[in-house]
Amino acid sequence: MIVQINDYFIGMIFKGNRLVRNTIPLREEEIFRFYNGKILDEPNKMCMKVGKIILKLYFADLDDKIARDLIDYELNVSSFTKKVLDEVKKIKFGETVSYGDIAKKLNTSPRAVGVALSKNPLPLIIPCHRVVAKNSLGGYSYGIEKKKFILEMEQIKKRLK
């Protein structure tokens, strides 16, 4: 399902009441490139609540640790991907860690970490955007400009705290 909040659209998939996949907030022309769902005319309260939390994460108005406490979610990923995502959850708001740093902790390669992060079903909620390459931003499923925007928003909000 796709929920519209203000000028943004957020794709979400639920299993019962648990969120299992979401997109980052996207403009209307972008949403269908990443998500082939139906825009809900009247989304239920749960969808709106989760959508608003994801929008706050996008604009760095909410810490992901708080969001994970507010959203009932389920990770359906391989055990390796789960280990990578568990490491990513430890990255503090406004900070970044390299693919190599995570790879060392898990005794694997930076490329394997990148592949696991590309399978993150809950972007922003699990902040894979905070993982960067040694000398660049690295990749991001929604494009490098989106990753740059999210990281810049977090830096601005961190300085204002």
UniProtKB/Swiss-Prot annotation:
Among the Pfam families in the record, one is OGT_N
Looking up SUPFAM superfamilies in the UniProt record yields: Methylated DNA-protein cysteine methyltransferase, C-terminal domain
Active-site residues, Swiss-Prot/TrEMBL: C128
Per UniProt, the keywords (alphabetical) are: Cytoplasm, DNA damage, DNA repair, Methyltransferase, Transferase
- Which enzyme type, at the first EC level? transferase
| Database matches in Gene3D superfamilies | 3.30.160.460, Winged helix-like DNA-binding domain superfamily/Winged helix DNA-binding domain (1.10.10.10)
Q: Which GO terms describe its molecular function?
A: methylated-DNA-[protein]-cysteine S-methyltransferase activity
Sorted alphabetically, the Gene Ontology cellular component annotations on this record are: cytoplasm
What are the EC numbers?
Answer: 2.1.1.63
Reactions that this protein is recorded to catalyse: a 6-O-methyl-2'-deoxyguanosine in DNA + L-cysteinyl-[protein] = S-methyl-L-cysteinyl-[protein] + a 2'-deoxyguanosine in DNA; a 4-O-methyl-thymidine in DNA + L-cysteinyl-[protein] = a thymidine in DNA + S-methyl-L-cysteinyl-[protein]
UniProt xrefs under PROSITE patterns: MGMT
* GO BP terms: DNA alkylation repair; methylation
Give its localization: Cytoplasm
State the family named in the UniProt similarity comment for this chain: Belongs to the MGMT family.
PANTHER family linked to this entry:
METHYLATED-DNA--PROTEIN-CYSTEINE METHYLTRANSFERASE
Q: Could you tell me what this protein does?
A: Involved in the cellular defense against the biological effects of O6-methylguanine (O6-MeG) and O4-methylthymine (O4-MeT) in DNA. Repairs the methylated nucleobase in DNA by stoichiometrically transferring the methyl group to a cysteine residue in the enzyme. This is a suicide reaction: the enzyme is irreversibly inactivated.
NCBIfam families assigned to the protein according to its UniProt record, in alphabetical order = ogt
What more does the entry say?
This enzyme catalyzes only one turnover and therefore is not strictly catalytic. According to one definition, an enzyme is a biocatalyst that acts repeatedly and over many reaction cycles.
State the protein's name. Answer: Methylated-DNA--protein-cysteine methyltransferase
Lineage here is:
Archaea, Methanobacteriati, Methanobacteriota, Methanomada group, Methanococci
